[in-house]
């Protein structure tokens, strides 16, 4: 059978690039990205990478903080694996030339962020970590892989229960292994820190092909998104800023708790706004803010540069769930792996701990690459490729703006049975188009279908989970319930199931 490469990677964020870096010597790797190679949330990432690298810190403490932030919903085995590998990942990036900030003594300059028990965040130029890491990884792989940029994957090519390639707007490509690393879905909300490419493509592609997805009701809203500059709309003000002394203050002069977990701080700001107050981040207590956080300072408007008290609001930031995978990044479909934000590894539980996202991408790329190297099997001749389902008679989808506004209002920081029921009904006329498995007449329609499909599943999951936990808050069920602890809501082939994640032990400091 025709084979265009050995490993296809869909996406170009940190998980995609680390996968390519680890596989490039053993296989012909083809990386496909729908935009520029640096157009990813990884490139936008500010705060840094969490690693228990300081004297007195250890992986057990990092594990406990991760578990607690995740509202006791995380996969304990995966969390431990991630935290145990964290220091090795930092050392690897060091070897690749990433210039992490250091103290005069030569040790790492470690930041403190919300819900961490100690300083353990390595960073570059205060809040430019993503750019530095991505540039170093790209430099290491660019001459050893095939890049297809500005190429959109519209469909996974399926043979029975395995994925054997991808269909793009430039044609079909076949390979024995496909890794999906397309990131999250923040663009389905009207306020988000995510780049315009974050439209949930990978999850929708996998789901339409029959892969299981889980925990999608757990959306993390970052409490400090800056919208005061049209050119920098959705600029994230890193948690590192609050770790260095930035204080959240309301227009009424009330000081909020700045270093609680993200879900707690976001809900508090949301409630203040509902009561008619604005919330500002007072940066005047940080000496030499412009030097420590130059990119953030540059992103402020003139007034906020002068006062150093920018207004902030919560925005969609991270999807804690995604494509269901095991500890090796394997999905429920053979030959298909998922790594990074697109995957549900269980390490974040119901609410991600700050600066664990880049770490997850690095560690699980390593896991997937290791498994691929150990189990690689070439494609065999005579495979049967499933034909496309019939194209819908007409393509009917909501506008992006309408979807964003409704998701923010009804399936956002606070949810209620009434709002979820309303949204579930609102989605019904669009679902035939949203479930269609390509080919698509244009990219904008494809992205809108992906967001609509995923938004509908998020809404239905949020309705099923009649409790509050982490990034999922039900105003009509404001407390967590024991019967929902470690209960996973999983979707596959149009139906949902509830499964219990095995609990090994309760993690605590």
Curated annotation (Swiss-Prot):
Cystine residue pairs: none
Protein's pathway: Cofactor biosynthesis; NAD(+) biosynthesis; iminoaspartate from L-aspartate (oxidase route): step 1/1
Residues the record marks as active site: 262 (proton donor/acceptor)
Pfam families recorded: FAD_binding_2, Succ_DH_flav_C
Reactions catalysed, as given in the entry: L-aspartate + O2 = iminosuccinate + H2O2
Coiled-coil spans in chain: none
Keywords in alphabetical order: Cytoplasm, FAD, Flavoprotein, Nucleotide-binding, Oxidoreductase, Pyridine nucleotide biosynthesis
InterPro entries (alphabetical): FAD-dep_OxRdtase_2_FAD-bd, FAD/NAD-bd_sf, Fum_R/Succ_DH_flav-like_C_sf, Fum_Rdtase/Succ_DH_flav-like_C, NadB, Succ_DH/fumarate_Rdtase_cat_sf
Keyword Ribosomal protein: no
Cell compartment(s), UniProt: Cytoplasm
This protein's record includes keyword Nucleotide-binding: yes
SUPFAM superfamilies reported in the protein's UniProt record: FAD/NAD(P)-binding domain, Succinate dehydrogenase/fumarate reductase flavoprotein C-terminal domain, Succinate dehydrogenase/fumarate reductase flavoprotein, catalytic domain
Record: residues binding FAD: 12-15, 34, 41-48, 201, 341, 357-358
Cofactor(s) it depends on: FAD
Cofactor note: Binds 1 FAD per subunit.
Main location: cytoplasm
GO CC annotation: cytoplasm
A molecular-function term among this protein's GO annotations: nucleotide binding
Annotated function: Catalyzes the oxidation of L-aspartate to iminoaspartate, the first step in the de novo biosynthesis of NAD(+).
UniProt family annotation: Belongs to the FAD-dependent oxidoreductase 2 family. NadB subfamily.
Name this protein carries in UniProt: L-aspartate oxidase
Organism expressing this protein natively: Halalkalibacterium halodurans (strain ATCC BAA-125 / DSM 18197 / FERM 7344 / JCM 9153 / C-125) (Bacillus halodurans)
């Amino acid at each position: 059978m025709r084979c265009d490469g050995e490993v296809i990677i869909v996406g170009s964020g940190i998980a995609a690039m680390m996968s390519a870096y680890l596989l490039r010597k053993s296989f012909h790797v083809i990386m496909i990205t729908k935009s520029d190679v640096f157009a990813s949330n990884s490139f936008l990432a500010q705060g840094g990478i969490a690693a228990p690298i300081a004297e007195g810190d250890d992986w057990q403490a990092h594990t406990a903080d991760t578990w607690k932030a995740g509202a006791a919903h995380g996969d304990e085995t995966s969390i431990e694996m991630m935290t145990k590998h964290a220091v090795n990942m930092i050392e690897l990036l060091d070897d690749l030339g990433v210039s992490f900030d250091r103290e005069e003594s030569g040790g790492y300059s470690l930041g403190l962020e919300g819900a961490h028990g100690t300083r353990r965040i390595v960073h570059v130029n205060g809040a430019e970590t993503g750019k530095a890491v991505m540039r170093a990884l790209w430099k290491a792989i660019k001459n050893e892989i095939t890049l297809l940029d500005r190429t959109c994957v519209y469909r996974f090519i399926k043979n029975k229960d395995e994925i054997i390639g991808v269909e793009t707007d430039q044609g079909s490509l076949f390979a024995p292994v496909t890794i999906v690393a397309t990131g999250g879905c923040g663009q389905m909300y009207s306020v988000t820190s995510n780049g315009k490419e974050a439209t949930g493509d990978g999850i929708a592609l996998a789901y339409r092909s029959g892969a299981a997805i889980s925990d999608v009701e757990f959306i993390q809203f970052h409490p400090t998104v800056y919208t005061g500059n049209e050119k920098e709309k959705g600029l994230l003000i890193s948690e590192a800023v609050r770790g260095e002394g930035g204080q959240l203050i309301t227009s009424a002069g009330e000081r909020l708790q700045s270093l609680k977990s993200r879900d707690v701080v976001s809900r508090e700001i949301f409630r203040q706004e509902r009561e008619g107050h604005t919330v500002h981040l007072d940066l005047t207590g940080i000496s030499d803010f412009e030097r420590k956080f130059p990119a953030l300072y540059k992103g402020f408007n003139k007034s906020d540069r002068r006062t150093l008290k920018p207004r902030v609001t919560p925005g969609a930031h991270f999807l804690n769930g995604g494509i269901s995978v095991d500890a090796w990044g394997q999905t429920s479909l053979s030959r298909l792996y998922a790594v990074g934000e697109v995957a549900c590894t269980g390490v974040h539980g119901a609410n991600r701990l700050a600066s664990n996202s880049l770490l997850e991408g690095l560690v699980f790329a390593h896991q997937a690459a290791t498994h691929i190297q150990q189990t690689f099997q070439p494609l065999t001749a005579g495979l049967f490729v499933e034909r496309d389902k019939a194209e819908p008679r007409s393509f009917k989808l909501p506008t992006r703006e309408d979807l964003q506004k409704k998701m923010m209002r009804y399936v956002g920081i606070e949810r209620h049975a009434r709002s979820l029921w309303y949204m579930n009904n609102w989605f019904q006329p669009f679902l035939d188009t949203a479930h269609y498995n390509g080919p698509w007449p244009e990219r904008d329609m494809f992205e809108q279908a992906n967001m609509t499909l995923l938004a509908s599943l998020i809404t239905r999951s949020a309705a099923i989970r009649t409790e509050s936990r982490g990034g999922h808050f039900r105003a009509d069920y404001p407390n967590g319930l024991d019967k929902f602890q470690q209960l996973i809501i999983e979707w596959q082939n149009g139906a949902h199931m509830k499964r219990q994640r095995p609990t090994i032990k309760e993690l605590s400091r």
